[in-house]
Amino acid sequence: MNTDIANLKNQCIEELSRIKSLQELEDFQVKYLGKKGILKSKLKELSKLEPAIRAQVGKELNSLREYLEESIAIQRKRFLEEEKQKRIQSERIDVTIPGKRVEIGAIHILSQVQNEIAEIFLNMGYEIAEGPEVELDYYNFEALNIPADHPARDTQDTFYISEDVLLRTHTSPVQIRVMKSKKPPIKIISPGRVYRSDEVDSTHSPIFHQIEGLFVDKGVTMADLKGTLEVFAKRFFGEQTKVRFRPHHFPFTEPSAEVDISCIFCGGKGCRTCKGEGWIEILGAGMVHRKVLLNCGIDPDIYTGFAFGMGVERIALLRYEIEDIRLFYENDLRFLKQFR
């Protein structure tokens, strides 16, 4: 029996020396020390031995079990340490490698232009006023002296949510809300998104941005309007810029005008951009209509005012010689990065 135990120990030592992984070690432990393992079977056979040798054999088997448990523990510790070192090496960070550059965002070109326009008027004493983009028909049309049969009120040009609710077609409703809630003097600009049922092409979009201005006080004249817009044009487009008013019609202003600036590309000599005329239209303006003042509870015999409005996209197109308005909305980084 002693010889069998010695042979078993030698067998275990040989198998242990060939083990190369933690999984092989676990299999070895199950084979020899498991519930159905070889050593367990040997211990069960002790009852069949003569009492004279049973104690000695049991002692040798227990000694072998302790040897195997200790050897397995040592091997397991070694394998775990090796795995730990491999993991450490695989997760090692080389602090000398340059870090990845963080891509920093920038203000969108339309926001840049809108902010610059707003800053010019803020420096002239204007305040910023805002209003809802989902608007009532009354504020968007009726209060602005736009009659029911006006083309702008057609469903083909306006996004109606219900009979009396729509997406505002201009930021003029903000002016109405301010005039109804404040007493003159009133001096505001109202930037924001507006919506019109236009087909998308290089110059049109169903969503775009406007900045409108309003000044109401005693003694405000057309000369004040012209002077204000001349200051804006020179500060935004350059001191050499000239301004021209052309008669026009808007239902909410009287008299009304379309405002041109001397072509910023040819200096008024005539080029492809200005179609040879030397002038480029930038906005509409005029004196606030008497009916609009009355609709807001302001006496037109005491107070007068002027209003103007421009498309932010149009101003940006002109300044940067961009030919397609869709570029502003497509989020193409190749385009946007040019204006950082």
From Swiss-Prot:
Keyword Magnesium: yes
Similarity comment text for this entry: Belongs to the class-II aminoacyl-tRNA synthetase family. Phe-tRNA synthetase alpha subunit type 1 subfamily.
Cofactor(s), names only, from the UniProt record: Mg(2+)
Cited CDD domains: PheRS_alpha_core
Name of the protein in question: Phenylalanine--tRNA ligase alpha subunit
Amino-acid positions noted as binding Mg(2+) in the UniProt annotation, renumbered to this chain: E254
Biological classification of the source: Bacteria, Bacillati, Bacillota, Bacillota incertae sedis, Caldicellulosiruptorales
Co-factor note (free text): Binds 2 magnesium ions per tetramer.
Single GO cellular component term: cytoplasm
Name of a matching Pfam family: Phe_tRNA-synt_N
Domain of life: Bacteria
Bridged cysteine pairs (disulfide): none
Predominant place of localization: cytoplasm
Enzyme Commission number(s) of this protein: 6.1.1.20
Annotated localization: Cytoplasm
Keywords from the named record: Aminoacyl-tRNA synthetase, ATP-binding, Cytoplasm, Ligase, Magnesium, Metal-binding, Nucleotide-binding, Protein biosynthesis
Database matches in InterPro entries: aa-tRNA-synth_II, aa-tRNA-synth_II/BPL/LPL, Phe-tRNA-synth_IIc_asu, Phe-tRNA_ligase_II_N, Phe_tRNA_ligase_alpha1_bac, Phenylalanyl-tRNA_Synthase, tRNA-bd_arm
